[in-house]
Amino acid sequence: MSCYREFYVGKRTGTYADTLAAVGLTKMLWALQGGGDAVVTVTEESSRFCVTLAEPVELHAERVSVLQRDPLYSFIVTKPGENAPDGTVPFDYVANKAIADAYREARKRKKAGEEQDELHDVSPKFYVYQKVNILQGISARNKLLEEIVAAKQEELAQAVVAKLAALANGRLASEAATKFNPKVAAVQVFNPSVGKGINRLKADGAGRGPLPSAFVDWFEEWLRFIGSDVVLSGNSIGDDIKMNVVVPARASYRHLSELEQLKFSYVRTSRKADILAVFDLVLFLMDKADVPTGTDWAYRVQVGEAPRDVFSAVQTAYFKSLGSAKPISNIASIGLPQWFSVQEEAHIVRWKTFIEEHRGVLFLLDEDKTEEAELLHLYRDFLSGDDWLSFLRFLGSYGCWSMKRREAKKPTRSFVKKHLEELFTLSQPRLPVVEVINNKGFQNIAKAIRQATVSEQYAKAKGRQIFEIKYGLFQEIKRKAKFREELLTVISEFISEFNYENARREEQLREAPGRRRKRVSMQDLQEFAELLDRFPNQKETEAIAMLLIAFASCKDDKGTDTEDQEADLAYTNEEVEI
């Protein structure tokens, strides 16, 4: 009898079907070693997943027989009176649906001001199974579970051993012929590549339909059903459905099993759903990062690691509603961030702070509006691909949007200046962006722009406006962002007007108390111009311009919306430059 320590699942479909199979295999091998403290790790490689055991396992009939008693995924009872196979633990979909419906009605009554009775909690799995049910995936998994439980013990054992041996030898599970060979329907919610599409090799008369069941390997689908109970989640996007699967980069089954209870944020828009799913995973990892290092099975981001070193991505499949059907319309992958690694406990706190702040800022964006949808798109590109230029473009565009939002007296949220500085410093210490934000001229000009825009907007709202509000300044900087001379002209003209207003205010007040602003010096402008000279590339110039808007539109270090805490400065006859 052969002993095996490593097993392989290829990335054949290019979808989350491969991930589901790899996670399912991880759980199966963990169970075959008795569960409990058994350590089974799944690692993502370029073209496959490798599932590794702490100790080699001998595959034989007696060992795998445990899978017949517990096929490792739930039988879902969707109709009153429906019974699960003997010995298996069912998931009561009917009862959980009744509780979910009660919650929905309770929310309506709460809005009407009525008192509410205490309700039982809905299982986090219900909302996943609900979407699987809509996508017609429950029948296939229930049917296979029934066949596994009812199979002849020796035939099932021989089949499982043969399939696992094939995976251990780097072959496909479908290459191992077995006497136990149930037919499994091709279901797109578990395997998006078998969804509606062109399946013939030639163009003449190509039919649109699912992959025939004869081409679907029952063991691979079994692994996917197991994996779906661990890492599959979803969102309703209007009448459409978006399913998500967490991709392990390097995680043990105990890592993954805790995801079964993770309740992802629920939103009804696609881009925001992607972003919040990543945020939820990062916060989940950071909450576990302070577990003692000696517990090798526990969830933690090790020293020197970033979130992407544990979970590489969230794979998605979008099912578009066409009335009576919801065919697959888009397959994508959203990477987890690798902004900076956790080097000490303080970094865990910073991660949490950044994520919560960014979540709050993005929450107000309405994806149904073109400008705000583009903001979310830029942020998602940054989050998924560590695309810092997209983030800078997001910050610049967000500054413009928030100015208009404030003037319309609509709620808005801003980034905190200190947090932005920390994010850039911790994540990009070797890149020019740190040199830019530490430049004294840049800092002083950004502060002056903030005083002439968001600070004076705040003063206007309080009935204390003194200076002109430069409403179009952010947009003008954004328009000229790629052109060094034109950008410098915009900044120079602003400084000239800013200093003129300050001088006129000083003349009006003379030695009387009142709110003043400090002028921008020629030295500041010179340092900013030299900064542009050091980074003459168009993208670099654009990055500096976007950073200028970002730091001009963010909150001060105290977390206040403006610098009005500095208002009504006592008169001084000392000329102090910013």
Give residue ranges: language-model regions.
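Basic, glycine-/proline-tolerant helical and adjacent loop/strand elements
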Residues: 103-275
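Hydrophobic, Leu/Ile/Phe/Ala-enriched alpha-helical segments that form helix-helix packing faces
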Residues: 29, 164, 168, 285-290
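Domain-exit/linker segments immediately C-terminal to small folded modules
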Residues: 194-372
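Long, contiguous all-alpha helical interaction modules
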Residues: 1-138, 302-578
